Design a protein with these regions (language model features):
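Catalytic cores of DNA base-excision repair glycosylases
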Residues: 3-214
């Protein structure tokens, strides 16, 4: 389906999810930075469960900068790729040195170990600073082609396509809104299409409607 005015159809989605806080239960930008790194290839739920113990021991970058990577293992040993993540976290703590110096621009964030474009966009969005890109996580990679706002499976390609459609002042909202849709409604299997606010334009739903009943 060719859509001329995507913002018209995205408005209900943005109203539902656009301002919702990220599922990581962080209390400040330092915690957000560390939890975003830990959550890569892991679940937000898992990171939330271990965060309290970790931050009780390492309440700031200053404390973390004094640690060795192996010191972190007892707190994050259940996290996927914990060995590399321990190295990255200690290295960035020594690089930034204090919480007030945590960057909030895309170029500066992606220079940090363990921070890619998606993670940087999450930090920018949650910090409330001007968007420079759009969050494209695994949920967005699945949902965006389903509803028809993007094609392909490459994150940067999907991001560029959505950026070309959505005005910049909505970039911080739209990626996370699509992600929440994927988490709650547009699941990998048995998506709840009948209650989805995007089913009016959704390619997946419209194709599903054409299939003969079994």
């Amino acid at each position: 389906m060719m859509i001329q005015d995507w913002m018209k159809y995205l408005e209900p989605l943005l109203k539902l999810y656009g301002k919702r806080k990220h599922p990581l239960n962080y209390k400040n930008r330092y915690q957000l930075l560390i939890m975003v790194i830990l959550s890569a290839q892991d679940s937000d739920k898992h990171i939330n469960e271990l965060a309290e113990n970790f931050f009780n021991v390492y309440p700031s970058l200053e404390f973390l900068a004094k640690a060795l990577p192996e010191d972190l293992h007892q707190y994050i040993g259940s996290v996927r790729n914990f060995g590399n993540k321990s190295e990255w976290i200690v290295k960035l703590a020594k690089t930034i040195s204090c919480d007030d110096k945590i960057p909030t621009t895309l170029d500066d964030l992606i220079k940090l170990p363990g921070i890619g474009r998606k993670s940087a966009n999450v930090i920018i969005r949650e910090s409330g600073t001007k968007a420079e890109g759009i969050i494209v996580d695994l949920h967005v990679i699945r949902v965006a082609p389903r509803i028809g706002i993007a094609t392909g499976v490459q994150p940067e390609r999907i991001e560029k396509q959505i950026m070309a459609i959505v005005p910049q002042e909505k970039w911080n909202e739209v990626g996370m809104a699509i992600s929440f849709l994927g988490r709650e409604i547009c699941r990998p299997t048995n998506p709840n299409c009948n209650i989805c606010v995007m089913n009016v334009v959704c390619n997946y739903y419209n194709e599903l409607a054409k299939r003969p009943a079994i």
